[in-house]
Amino acid sequence: GFNNLSNTVKILAMAEDLEAHAKAVSIRQSFADEAINIKQRSSFISRSTNETNIYINLNIDGTGQYNISTGLKFFDHMLEQFAKHGSFDLSIQALGDLDIDEHHTIEDVAITLGDAFSKAIGERSGIERYSSNETLVMDETISSVSIDMASRTMLKMDSPKLKDYVGDFPTEMFEHFFISFINTLGFTCHISTEGKNSHHIVEATFKSFTRALSKALKLNDSQILSTKGIL
């Protein structure tokens, strides 16, 4: 298996001066070890392209533990909020081409995170499905999110104009993160945020979004909540 070969691969990679590849193998090995101990609605996903290497370990039924490293400090902070306020156990390691710009890293993390949730959720039976008007305030900012976990993909997002960057996070990627995540996982989401401070607007939106997602994914005793028989 992977763990049996990983040390050999790392040694060969370092010998050939492929430090990034050796690091990627180390990350994947640690994630594989961690995934063995998770038995709830969980998944381990990796995604590798010429632009990024993303590794995500997710436990939906967690307690909000996290280990996040994307190379973008503010993005890390938002993903930590995502894990904590959604009560998801979440490990993310991203190695991206940040020497070019931030776009590929943020987009690919969103896509891989959507894949991780999709794998962990499975057929979507026995979940609440809906979360309506999950509202959160942060000083002058208020954000409200509603979700339907039926597999009809749509995002309607209303948010004030932001300054170009919050920390090292380009705000043109703010909505794009949610688009990429929602398109990959497949559900309907309405986001409405009002405020003045760009930091507050982004953070309040991430928090209300993850709280809504957590409620929509909460387990119940019902079968699939649809007369169609599928979501």
Stretch-by-stretch model annotation:
Residues 18-21, 27-231:
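Structural preference for solvent-exposed beta-strand-turn elements
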Residues 1-12:
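Acidic, Mg2+-coordinating phosphoryl-transfer loop and its flanking beta/alpha structural elements
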